[in-house]
Curated annotation (Swiss-Prot):
Gene name as annotated: CECB
Protein name, per record: Cecropin-B
Induction of its expression: Induced as part of the humoral response to a bacterial invasion. Transcripts appear within the immunized fat body.
Annotated function: Cecropins have lytic and antibacterial activity against several Gram-positive and Gram-negative bacteria.
A Pfam entry, by short name: Cecropin
Record-linked InterPro entries: Cecropin (IPR000875)
Family under the similarity heading: Belongs to the cecropin family.
GO BP annotations, alphabetical order: antibacterial humoral response; defense response to Gram-positive bacterium; innate immune response
Record key words, sorted: Antibiotic, Antimicrobial, Immunity, Innate immunity, Secreted, Signal
Organism: Spodoptera litura (Asian cotton leafworm)
PROSITE patterns referenced in this protein's UniProt entry, alphabetically: CECROPIN (PS00268)
Localization: Secreted
Cleaved signal peptide residues: 1-21
Keyword Phosphoprotein annotated: no
Length: 58
């Protein structure tokens, strides 16, 4: 499920917005998607550490 969401965010961020003012909403959505994608990328190592710690605890 996460990989599907990540692929959608990549596709959303790859769309280039036109310089017209009515595309401002799409630029905001693109920026939000970029922030979410960056957050997922930064959280990856922490999730791996938690998973390995949980495995060691068993």
């Amino acid at each position: 499920i996460l990989s599907f969401v990540f692929a959608c965010l990549l596709a959303l961020s790859a769309v280039s917005a036109a310089p017209e003012p009515r595309w401002k909403v799409f630029k905001k959505i693109e920026k939000m998607g970029r922030n979410i994608r960056d957050g997922i990328v930064k959280a990856g190592p922490a999730i791996e550490v938690l998973g390995s710690a949980k495995a060691l605890g068993k």
